[in-house]
Amino acid sequence: MNGIDGNKPLNRADEVERLIDAVKALIIPFIRAADEAVPSRAAGELLPNSQGAVHNALIDSRRPEDLVRELSLRLPQGEGLGEDGLLQTISDVLKYSVNTWDQGFMDKLYASTNPVGVISELLLGVLNSNVHVYQVSPALTVIEKHTAKTLAGLFGFTGPRAGGVTCQGGSSSNLTSIVIARNTLYPECKTQGNSNRSFVLFTSVHGHYSVEKAAVTCGLGSSAVWTVPVDARSGRMDASALRSLVQRAQAEGKTPLYVNATAGTTVLGSYDPFEAIAAVCKEFGLWLHIDASWGGPAIFSAAHRHKLRGCHLANSLTVNPHKMMNVPVTCSFLLGPDTAVFHRANTLPAGYLFHSSSPSSSSPSPPQITSTDNEKPIPEISAQPPLGKEEDVQKEEEAEEVWDLADLTLQCGRRADSLKLALSWIYHGAAGFERQVDHAFAVAAHLAELVSQRDDFVLVSENPPPCLQVCFYYAHGGKVAEDHQVNTARTRAMVQKLVSRGYMVDYAPGERGSFFRVVVNAQTLKTTVEGLVKALVAIGREVVG
């Protein structure tokens, strides 16, 4: 069907059914190929599949210019190509895309989704809702508020207006937190801009680059971001160094505003000392944000929850279920102890969209959101009180509950990303999440132990590592090369050669040149990392000779 014929009845349901069946015939073999490649990933080399063919299910690698030629993408300027053209394009996309379902994908801080994730994306596509106002997305609004409130409760945000909203990824959540911090601590900035203030944001030297991006976006400039030194071994922020930098900023006539602490840094996976950092923030009246995009889901695990000790002291917190929890990309929550603060910082009059602070009398009354789920509580924590002027805090205490969620964010168009976590939570339960998190951490520890036991490698990460990435150098003859450029060249060459064996891993710069950064996830098998080590040993001999 290439359009609507006003003289014929709609038959969209049958068309959707037919196309879903046709696409299903393409995507199921794609996923199955990854499942069938498990023996190859355990072996460290490609093995014949069930049909006797040797195939790299992870990726059919091409250079960009070659892929442009192979795809030969054309967007018809006249009549469309219909179902045949659609299915051929989908087939090509699958053929030339990285199969993140493959065990060998250990490259970035995310992995494949899972069967529930696929279903959730399908449902969102069918609904095609915009969760900006309650009127057009009633069920999804209730789900987002309840899911965010329950998730916030795990981090110790347990007040009556605790909760959060989803944003378009962790960078967007972090950006939104900075806007909220500025407009809360300095309300005049919402209408007058930054004026003559020279704000300073503080983040770990190992923190995510999104803080600098946000500073640029907010008109502060990247130079407004001051990086705080970390402990050389653990990679954790030095709270005493933070305090000194805050004092220096004040002495220079600047306005310290915001501290970004990290739960799971991008390279080493470090968890900053939140209690010590919170003490500095309290002393100087700074906004404390925790970027738990990567390491936040450890909160589900009794064994690893301690890494987030002090998270309840934050004024806001980012967590991305699409990273550690195999929820489809993107799914990012910005959480806090009081969402009235979010609303006051971001709300603007838009009478054509926001008709009232609560649903109209003709709309069904939304239920009161409470945290009655049977999640495991975090002991001895209570939420940080809101920051801001006394009269503003009083207004928050009297604020009505907000159901038009776009009014709490920088967005208008909002996809219902919370549904993806909600359905996964309903399917697996908090206990299932705990098992997944514990398994992933155990696999990371297993890989670190394998690396530490071999003379071919030198571990950079702690053993066990704090999060799910394991960092190490290749050490020919039991020794890392003195020349940094040699180490970098070896690492990059070995990473490239791994692809032909069915593995994708990353590398990062270090004191002795670039080293391997391998990221495992909740679906990674121990045999997979054992196979990876076998492959690295073999490739190392090829590269070094």
Predicted regions and their residues:
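Active-site nucleophile and cofactor-binding loops and adjacent substrate-binding regions
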Residues: 139-140, 164-171, 203-204, 262
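N-terminal entrance/gating region of PLP-dependent enzymes' catalytic architecture
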Residues: 2-161, 502-504, 516, 532-536
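Conserved PLP-enzyme active-site core in the AAT-like
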Residues: 173, 179-343, 347, 360-362, ...
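PLP-dependent enzyme catalytic core of the Aspartate aminotransferase-like
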Residues: 389, 510-545
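Short Gly/Ser/Thr- and Asp/Glu-enriched loop/turn motifs at secondary-structure junctions
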Residues: 160-161, 196, 462-468, 509-515
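Short loop-beta-helix segment that forms the pyridoxal 5′-phosphate
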Residues: 151-179, 226-229
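Active-site C-terminal subdomain of aminotransferase-like
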Residues: 265, 310-455, 462-463
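Conserved PLP-binding catalytic core of the aspartate aminotransferase-like
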Residues: 459-497
